[in-house]
C-alpha cells in the first residue's frame, strides 16, 4: 500500500525539480543573454536591480525552483535517514511517554523506497531489545512502536500471572531448542506513574497516566508497579498493573502451540510494549514481518506533557535525549 504523504512529497519534489532544471538550463541562460545585451547597450551602468527588471524571472518559476532544494532535502532525510514520530499512547511507558516526539533511524533495517517501502538495500536486522517502529500487520496504514522481544526462531513464553518472559532461541528448525536466554527481573517496586479510570458523559470508559509522587494518591487511580527486565545483555524498565490479569483468551494462538507460547517464524518478530498490561502487541495479534519494519527509535527531540487525545499542558525538556 502506498504511503500517501510520501507519494505527495515525491510528486512535489519531481515537479519542482523539473522547474528548477528548466530554469537553470533553459530560462536562466536566456535571461543572462538579455541582461548582458542591456548592460552593453547602457555602457555597463545598470545595477543588479535594474538588470532583474530587464529579464525578470516569472513568479511561478521562481517559487517552484526555490522550493525544490528544500523539498529534496526533506524527502531524502525523511525517507532514508531520520523521520519524526509522535508517541500517541502509553503502551511504551516508562521508556516513552504520551507526548514524546522521537527520531526514527530509517536506515537501521534497510534502505527502502519511500512510497511502497520495498527494501532496496539491506543494512541490518532488529536486535533483541530494539525499540522498533513498524506498520501494524492488520492495518498497514497505522504505525506502531514496540520493543523487539522475540527474534526469528525464538520460542517466546509469557506467564500472565508472574508477567515474566521465557525465551529459547533456535526453535524454528524442528530440532531441540537452544538453551534458554538469560531473562532476569528486579524486585517489584512502586513506579512514579498512576493510571486513572473514569467515564465520559456518554459512558465511554477512559484511562489516563499521571506522574504522581509516591507519597501522594490520585482519585480513581492505581499506582503502577515497575521492575527492570533483562533480556540477555539488554536491560529496560517495564510497568504492570498490580491488580490486572491479562485477557489470555484474547491471545493470538499459534497453530500447534500452547496458549501464551509462540515460535517466531523466519523473517518475523515478536513485539511487546514496556507497559505490559496496557499494550496491544504480538501477544494479541501475532508477529511483525520484516517488510513492515520502518526503523529504530533512537532519540527524543521534544516532549509535551499531555494525555491521550488532549491538548498539551507543558513541556518536558528533561526528556530530550537518547532512548534506551
Swiss-Prot record:
<dbReference type="GO" id="GO:0004252">
    <property type="term" value="F:serine-type endopeptidase activity"/>
</dbReference>
<comment type="similarity">
    <text>Belongs to the peptidase S26 family.</text>
</comment>
<dbReference type="GO" id="GO:0004175">
    <property type="term" value="F:endopeptidase activity"/>
</dbReference>
<feature type="transmembrane region" description="Helical">
    <location>
        <begin position="4"/>
        <end position="22"/>
    </location>
</feature>
<feature type="transmembrane region" description="Helical">
    <location>
        <begin position="59"/>
        <end position="77"/>
    </location>
</feature>
<dbReference type="InterPro" id="IPR019756">
    <property type="entry name" value="Pept_S26A_signal_pept_1_Ser-AS"/>
</dbReference>
<protein>
    <recommendedName>
        <fullName>Signal peptidase I</fullName>
        <ecNumber>3.4.21.89</ecNumber>
    </recommendedName>
</protein>
<feature type="topological domain" description="Periplasmic">
    <location>
        <begin position="78"/>
        <end position="324"/>
    </location>
</feature>
<dbReference type="GO" id="GO:0006508">
    <property type="term" value="P:proteolysis"/>
</dbReference>
<feature type="active site">
    <location>
        <position position="91"/>
    </location>
</feature>
<dbReference type="GO" id="GO:0006465">
    <property type="term" value="P:signal peptide processing"/>
</dbReference>
<feature type="active site">
    <location>
        <position position="146"/>
    </location>
</feature>
<dbReference type="InterPro" id="IPR000223">
    <property type="entry name" value="Pept_S26A_signal_pept_1"/>
</dbReference>
<keyword id="KW-1015">Disulfide bond</keyword>
<dbReference type="GO" id="GO:0005886">
    <property type="term" value="C:plasma membrane"/>
</dbReference>
<feature type="topological domain" description="Cytoplasmic">
    <location>
        <begin position="23"/>
        <end position="58"/>
    </location>
</feature>
<keyword id="KW-0378">Hydrolase</keyword>
<keyword id="KW-0645">Protease</keyword>
<keyword id="KW-1133">Transmembrane helix</keyword>
<dbReference type="GO" id="GO:0008233">
    <property type="term" value="F:peptidase activity"/>
</dbReference>
<dbReference type="InterPro" id="IPR019533">
    <property type="entry name" value="Peptidase_S26"/>
</dbReference>
<feature type="disulfide bond">
    <location>
        <begin position="171"/>
        <end position="177"/>
    </location>
</feature>
<dbReference type="InterPro" id="IPR019766">
    <property type="entry name" value="Sign_pep_all-beta_subdom"/>
</dbReference>
<keyword id="KW-0812">Transmembrane</keyword>
<feature type="topological domain" description="Periplasmic">
    <location>
        <begin position="1"/>
        <end position="3"/>
    </location>
</feature>
<dbReference type="InterPro" id="IPR036286">
    <property type="entry name" value="LexA/Signal_pep-like_sf"/>
</dbReference>
<keyword id="KW-1003">Cell membrane</keyword>
<keyword id="KW-0472">Membrane</keyword>
<dbReference type="Pfam" id="PF10502">
    <property type="entry name" value="Peptidase_S26"/>
</dbReference>
<keyword id="KW-0997">Cell inner membrane</keyword>
<dbReference type="GO" id="GO:0016485">
    <property type="term" value="P:protein processing"/>
</dbReference>
<dbReference type="InterPro" id="IPR019757">
    <property type="entry name" value="Pept_S26A_signal_pept_1_Lys-AS"/>
</dbReference>
<feature type="modified residue" description="Blocked amino end (Met)">
    <location>
        <position position="1"/>
    </location>
</feature>
<dbReference type="InterPro" id="IPR019758">
    <property type="entry name" value="Pept_S26A_signal_pept_1_CS"/>
</dbReference>
Amino acid at each position: 500500500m502506498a504511503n500517501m504523504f510520501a507519494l505527495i512529497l515525491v510528486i512535489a519534489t519531481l515537479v519542482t525539480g523539473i522547474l528548477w532544471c528548466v530554469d537553470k538550463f533553459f530560462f536562466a541562460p536566456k535571461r543572462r543573454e538579455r541582461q548582458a545585451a542591456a548592460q552593453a547597450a547602457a555602457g555597463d551602468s545598470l545595477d543588479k536591480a535594474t538588470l532583474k527588471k530587464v529579464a525578470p524571472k516569472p513568479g511561478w518559476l521562481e517559487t517552484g525552483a526555490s522550493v525544490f532544494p528544500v523539498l529534496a532535502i526533506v524527502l531524502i532525510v525523511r525517507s532514508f535517514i531520520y523521520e519524526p514520530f509522535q508517541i500517541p499512547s502509553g503502551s511504551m511507558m516508562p521508556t516513552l511517554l504520551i507526548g514524546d516526539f522521537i527520531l526514527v533511524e530509517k536506515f537501521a533495517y534497510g534502505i527502502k523506497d519511500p512510497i511502497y517501502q520495498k527494501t532496496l538495500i539491506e543494512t541490518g536486522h532488529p536486535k533483541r531489545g530494539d525499540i522498533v517502529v513498524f506498520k501494524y500487520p492488520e492495518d498497514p496504514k497505522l504505525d506502531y512502536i514496540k520493543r523487539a522481544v522475540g527474534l526469528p526462531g525464538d520460542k517466546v513464553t509469557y506467564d500472565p500471572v508472574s508477567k515474566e518472559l521465557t525465551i529459547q532461541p533456535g526453535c524454528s528448525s524442528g530440532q531441540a531448542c537452544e538453551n534458554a536466554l538469560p531473562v532476569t527481573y528486579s524486585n517489584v517496586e512502586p513506579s512514579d506513574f498512576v493510571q486513572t479510570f473514569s467515564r465520559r458523559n456518554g459512558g465511554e470508559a477512559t484511562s489516563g497516566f499521571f506522574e504522581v509522587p509516591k507519597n501522594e494518591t490520585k482519585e480513581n487511580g492505581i499506582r503502577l508497579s515497575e521492575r527492570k527486565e533483562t533480556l540477555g545483555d539488554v536491560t529496560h524498565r517495564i510497568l504492570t498493573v498490580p491488580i490486572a490479569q491479562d485477557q489470555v483468551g484474547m491471545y493470538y494462538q499459534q497453530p500447534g502451540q500452547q496458549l501464551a507460547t509462540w515460535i517466531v517464524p523466519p523473517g518475523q518478530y515478536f513485539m511487546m510494549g514496556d507497559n505490559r498490561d496496557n499494550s496491544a502487541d504480538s501477544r494479541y495479534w501475532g508477529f511483525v514481518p520484516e517488510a513492515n519494519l520502518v526503523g529504530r527509535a533512537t532519540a527524543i527531540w521534544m516532549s509535551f506533557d499531555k494525555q491521550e487525545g488532549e491538548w498539551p499542558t507543558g513541556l518536558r525538556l528533561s526528556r530530550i535525549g537518547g532512548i534506551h
